[in-house]
Amino acid sequence: IHMEKILVLNSGSSSLKYQLFNVDGDKFEVVAKGLADRIGIEGSLVTIKVGDGDKVTTELPLPTHKEAIKEVLDLLLGSVLKSIDELSGVGHRVVHGGEYFDRSVLVDDEVIRIIDGLSTLAPLHNPAAVMGIKAVKALLPNVPQVVAFDTAFHQTMKPEAYMYALPLEQYKKYKIRRYGAHGTSHLFVSREAAKLIGKAGKIIPCHIGNGASISAVKDGVCVDTSMGFTPLAGVVMGTRSGDVDPFVPLYI
């Protein structure tokens, strides 16, 4: 049986979460996982946890995302990988794909350009994702990369769900609309719920954390979601206000 090894990265502005999976068809096994934290800041560190083992933490300078990914690869090579050639691919979580992507795609220069161009809509996430993609491209030029977008799952919403009550020109010119976020999470949760319930039907998946969102899913397809033009809109969250009357900041 041929097991593929896939490295999945979630790049933040000063952190990088990673998991290495053994993939056999539709079966996934976490081989190792960890975090590179405080990238570009004093006191940076990298952690690794292999299988059910203890988490091991190493403090070392991590000036850039490229250096962080290099250290992660070195840790994996020293524990669960015999060679970098064992890696079949690298996957990245990207927050904002705008209207360009309704599914995961292979990375090429045009994809990188689009992700970078959408940075104003996800300033904490998209620039970091681009740094991670470029770092992998430099370190592992022959390994294919795939990006999965938080917005992709919500691209099935109809205009009555995603359009704001603004002049149509604002949408046509600036693409101002509801995009949603946490789509990968909503897709997974709605699928798992459907399995447990025994039918797809109507499901309300909730993603609750420092960022939080709720979606409406009918027969496996997203029909509405709480987040909007950016991940700031919607319900009250751990570190974001959610919806606030637009006059409040002007009043203050």
Annotated model-derived regions:
Residues 2-98:
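N-terminal glycine/serine-rich phosphate-binding loop of ATP-dependent small-molecule kinases
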Residues 114-132, 136, 174-176, 183-187:
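A gly/proline- and charged-residue-enriched helix-loop-helix capping module
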Residues 91-93, 146-149, 204-211:
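Short beta-strand segments
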Residues 84, 127, 131, 140-142, ...:
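Non-transmembrane, aqueous-exposed alpha-helical and coiled segments at domain scale
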Residues 73, 77, 133, 137, ...:
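Generic structural signal for well-ordered alpha-helical scaffold segments
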Residues 153-252:
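Glycine-rich phosphate-binding loop of actin/hexokinase-like ATP-binding domains
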Residues 133-136, 140-156:
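Conserved Class I SAM-dependent methyltransferase catalytic core
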Residues 76-125, 146, 153-161:
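Short beta-strand-loop/turn "lid" adjacent to the catalytic site in phosphate-handling enzymes
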